[in-house]
């Protein structure tokens, strides 16, 4: 975070037997097993999310983790490091879309534990194929084009697995930007239900 946004992060003060203890709000929520994935998915942010997932697993491998997502998407490799960690660790990772989950954000949303993937009522979800750009020698461009097609197939296969949609349907639906409401995301299988209020 930048110094400006650091100054805007609220602090929570708690009374303990040893006196007062202050936390920034995100650290306090981490104690409740809540992780925020907000903004562009990039390497630094992905490393922080992965570290939090691993930490919470070490604290209690049998208790669910809640991953709140508000992201326009970003780097495929950074996102895949989060996804692979979500699948690897023992606790179930419940995903919640607030605001938007687009591109890699939508992929991570769908990658949550089955039956524990949610959207808030006014959130938006968008799936599409991976973006890529490369310049250089023709042979290098050809190598990168082949790699992006491999990544596209891998992402579509995993999306088909998590949504229950046939691969051919996912391939067609991700060909262009495909926006969905919370209810449409449930219908498609990206999430399991829309949360309107706590039980």
From Swiss-Prot:
* GO cellular component terms given for this protein: cytoplasm; endopeptidase Clp complex
What keyword terms does UniProt attach to this protein?
Answer: Cytoplasm, Hydrolase, Protease, Serine protease
Superkingdom of origin organism: Bacteria
Group of enzyme by EC? hydrolase
Q: Please give the catalytic activity noted in the UniProt record.
A: Hydrolysis of proteins to small peptides in the presence of ATP and magnesium. alpha-casein is the usual test substrate. In the absence of ATP, only oligopeptides shorter than five residues are hydrolyzed (such as succinyl-Leu-Tyr-|-NHMec, and Leu-Tyr-Leu-|-Tyr-Trp, in which cleavage of the -Tyr-|-Leu- and -Tyr-|-Trp bonds also occurs)
Q: What is its EC number?
A: 3.4.21.92
UniProt GO MF annotations: ATP-dependent peptidase activity; ATPase binding; serine-type endopeptidase activity
Q: What's the family?
A: Belongs to the peptidase S14 family.
Free-text function comment from the UniProt entry: Cleaves peptides in various proteins in a process that requires ATP hydrolysis. Has a chymotrypsin-like activity. Plays a major role in the degradation of misfolded proteins.
What does the annotation say about its assembly with partners?
A: Fourteen ClpP subunits assemble into 2 heptameric rings which stack back to back to give a disk-like structure with a central cavity, resembling the structure of eukaryotic proteasomes.
Instruction: Provide the protein name.
Output: ATP-dependent Clp protease proteolytic subunit
**What species was this sequence derived from?**
Photobacterium profundum (strain SS9)
